[in-house]
Amino acid sequence: PTKGKVACHICTCDDDVYAVNYSSGSAIHFPDTLAVHEGKGINPKRQEMPHTHFVGATPDKKYICVTDLGLDKIFFCDRNLNTCFTAAVPQGYGARHLAFSDDGQYIYCVNELVSSVTVFEYDGKSVKPRETYSALPNEFCGTNLGAAIRIYKNRLYVSNRGHNSIAVFDINDDKLELSDFIMTGDHPRDFNIADDMIFCCNMNDDTVTLYSINDSLRLIDTISVKAPLCVNFE
């Protein structure tokens, strides 16, 4: 058991296994080391308490990172989930998931509540915030929630639930340039990339859609899957 409510993300680091519990604002190092966050953010509906959403190791394996959507923070912890230091996104943004650059020098955080990406520079012992970039087109005025974030071949991809798209950014160290949008099915909660193919989980229309990176991001197949939430590869 994860010793919390609504477990939503899991990771391994060597032989250690970690998970986070969204509704109880906690992280666990299995089997029984629990870290419970305290506090709240400025959004009364979504940040009334801590909401841990992602756990993952930095590429150098020095820290276990835990994002807290309710506190607008990223916690950098030791292997026993003791907090070493934190990094913050702007208030009310809602830090959701992280992606790490191939060289390990940059961390990219998708902010669920404002549909943006905040870039941090990481030197192995601290992080510095750089810039925040919108993942939506300027003309979009509807409701949207940022969701998944991935890096593949010097591009960064972020899914939008509402605009129903995957935003494509070109990466230049700590700079991002929004270059394209892939239009998806309804509510693309998660996606992943392998062999130049994007596999996108469209939760509300029961499909997984496949796109070819080498063929101008063209839709090449649609698979029926009931309420898909996550896609991963062995």
Short names for language-model regions:
Residues 25-28, 72-74, 115-117, 164-166, ...:
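Structural signal for beta-propeller blades
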